[in-house]
């Protein structure tokens, strides 16, 4: 009788443990759903253009991080702006209540923000992770290399010719161009927390160059602290910001 009871208890524990374990397909679909529904987070965005024909001072772009929410787009970002021969300057940028504020070289400026949420500092627009065509790749687990570290599972898009061509297609769709690449490297990652069954982090990087240009372009970004409560506060000195004139069409 004791053996029967033990056998029943063992069987029950196995069933329960099986029920609590989440399948790969289930995690991928949860990642897809939560990515589509993201509202905010701590963003890091890097955009660098390097001229391989110039030995030194050959890079321009930006490297910024901070809080950002998507609807409507608002952010508070700090970092650096790189200007080739002119070196690096601190970059402090805010978008709040439809007005864009920027501090460069200790001077504050402001102008009307975008009405369509499109901005160089909009992670949702810049990140290849958040585009529908990329999210659709989550429907097939064979597209992904999977690694586990404690409660965290990382889904990393595989490096195959077929998937590279797909990533190029997605990238070009946003560029609205179809360049011929001499170099194209990509990393697309989603990190999922199996303990709280929540999406934990997004990461992407694309390095691209064409045979018709000496320029190599790197775009990279991370989004963490997903759906955090964000309230953008403007620095007191931003009240002295000078109005930037809009460019005439």
Model-derived features with residue positions:
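Subset-of-secretome marker
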Residues: 20-249
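Positively charged n-region of N-terminal signal peptides that target proteins for export
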Residues: 1-7
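C-terminal motif of bacterial Sec signal peptides marking the signal peptidase cleavage site
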Residues: 15-18
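Nucleotide-cofactor and metal-assisted catalytic machinery
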Residues: 11
